């Protein structure tokens, strides 16, 4: 039987950030860890012939400095929620969870996690943009900041930064079930906490290491009760056996705990992914049902065949609209 190291048993640290305060803070929180100095994070992260599926069982941590910028315009497959100046930020690369369908598996060459400790430079880059226009920024697309908050403290820092900049609204998206954070952080109406919620069957089969759906629902309620605007993301919807029953039960579970009228909004969308990402994922995960489904290729993006996609999305809109006004339900198009 294969024996894996524990998560973050090995930490690679760029020589240029060994004395950075955040590097020291992170290393102080890790026990029984082997620390290895490197010249550049890409020496480890971008090595050829890495197996992301194998690394998911024993992720290494890489502490690095971002020197090329972290703020990007939003991608076509992502929802802007009607916001004009839509950007996302990569202050981390990769996620401690292991969702089989996640596009990160196709985008990155490694399953290891990179944390850019020079958050102050990312804030400076963002301030230059904010001097020109208002910004809607997703800060947790390429990682789950909430899930690793005890180690990095980035969520706290993003909230504090946003409170100081009135023309900035951020979204922090997560599959973490942590409830303890929100009561300890001062709420801001421009910090949207977004929870991705899936049916129990989908979570059990494909969302490895992520918090259980009911734990995410409880955490979303905690965030709402603490004064944060909360977004629920039923996205991506995953086609599975008895999908109608699975998603119907999930909606019932959600709105038995959460008052839909108090939600900031809701996101609905079926699974879609870049053709290049899926090609790479299929090579790495030949036995994954969700990765190897016979999707349709529409203009370079794989998605469910039209009959499946429209049935799932229309079903979900109808189910959610019993609890949430339709003008607060957003669809990916």
Where are these regions (language model features)?
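Flexible, acidic/Gly-rich N-terminal and inter-domain linker regions that tether
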Residues: 1-85
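Auxiliary Fe-S-binding modules of radical SAM enzymes
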Residues: 1-24, 255-333
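Conserved Radical SAM active-site core
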Residues: 62-85, 100-194
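Cysteine-centered iron-sulfur cluster-binding motifs in ferredoxin-type domains/subunits
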Residues: 89-99
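Structured alpha-helical segments in the cores of large, soluble enzyme domains
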Residues: 125-131, 181-183, 213-226, 316
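Conserved C-terminal portion of the radical SAM core fold
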Residues: 216-276, 324, 330-331
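Conserved radical SAM core fold
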Residues: 143-146, 177-180, 191-211, 236-240, ...
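Short, electropositive alpha-helical surface patch
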Residues: 152, 193-196, 243-259, 285-292
């Amino acid at each position: 039987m294969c024996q894996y190291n524990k998560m973050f048993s090995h930490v690679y640290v760029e020589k240029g950030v060994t004395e950075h305060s955040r590097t020291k803070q992170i290393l102080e929180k890790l026990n029984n860890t082997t620390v290895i100095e490197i010249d550049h994070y890409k020496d480890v992260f971008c090595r050829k012939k890495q197996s992301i599926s194998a690394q998911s069982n024993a992720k290494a941590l890489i502490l690095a400095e971002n020197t090329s910028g972290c703020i990007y315009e939003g991608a076509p497959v992502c929802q802007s929620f009607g916001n004009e100046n839509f950007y996302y930020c990569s202050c981390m690369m990769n996620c401690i969870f292991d969702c089989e369908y996640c596009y990160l598996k196709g985008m990155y060459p490694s399953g290891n996690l990179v944390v850019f400790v020079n958050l102050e430079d990312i804030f400076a880059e963002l301030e230059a943009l904010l001097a020109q226009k208002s910004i809607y920024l997703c800060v947790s697309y390429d990682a789950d900041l909430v899930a690793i908050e005890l180690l990095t403290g980035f969520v706290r820092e993003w909230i504090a930064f946003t409170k100081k900049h009135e023309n900035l609204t951020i979204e922090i998206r997560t599959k973490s079930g942590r409830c303890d954070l929100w009561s300890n952080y001062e709420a801001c109406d421009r910090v949207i906490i977004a929870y991705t919620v899936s049916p129990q069957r989908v979570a059990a089969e494909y969302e490895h290491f992520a918090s259980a759906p009911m734990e995410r629902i409880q955490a979303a309620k905690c965030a709402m009760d603490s004064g944060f605007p909360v977004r629920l993301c039923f996205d991506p919807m995953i086609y599975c056996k008895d999908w109608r029953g699975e998603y119907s039960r999930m909606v019932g579970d959600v709105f038995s705990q959460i008052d839909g009228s108090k939600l900031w909004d809701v996101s609905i969308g079926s699974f879609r992914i870049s053709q290049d990402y899926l090609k790479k994922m299929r090579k790495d995960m030949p036995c994954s049902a969700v990765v190897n489904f016979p999707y349709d290729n529409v203009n370079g993006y794989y998605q469910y065949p039209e009959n499946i996609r429209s049935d799932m999305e229309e079903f979900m809109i109808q189910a959610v609209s019993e609890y949430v006004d339709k003008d607060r339900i957003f669809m990916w198009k």
